[in-house]
């Protein structure tokens, strides 16, 4: 697909960020991801030291998997924790991490990569106190970035979400209190808020961009470069952004 689309792209435009996500790409073997990274590097002109990020499902990855992935060319890992509370994870049918979070962080730090942690609030069995406990544990692990996403309950779009209604979901007011509790903990730990849901350490490039008036946002989220308003997406359901226009790939893998 990359080779098919390449003739239509601006060959003078340098690529500054590469992101594997919109799902859980770590179901692919590390060797295949390494080969794909190499093909992207050979195909596009990259800036010096571009960001190469990948979203990871810790419920599927062993220590060896983390180590192999860290040597596959990635320099930023987004770990989809969602919650440290086992009851919450079981209710939403989310596999708990195979390794203790401390082990994962130790492995990645030894490989010299940057670490993001993603959390969801508004899930069944979550309370203000339980989510605060999760965020406090996250802070103790000292990730470079921490993101608190609000769970969007849209069963008409994703019918499998309907089953969560049997357990019950937190109200809007309860979700607001969860977020405010998390925000308070993060700010007291000297994490800096970026927009609505990102919190970063003071040495993070997003915070530097915010201070310098160079923070931007594209379809993927916050970024430090205006040029990332151009997003070339590949793969099933991938969404490209070309200036103010968007285009989405088919959701049918056979198509």
What are these regions (language model features)?
Residues 1-8, 14-255:
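C-terminal scaffold of the Radical SAM
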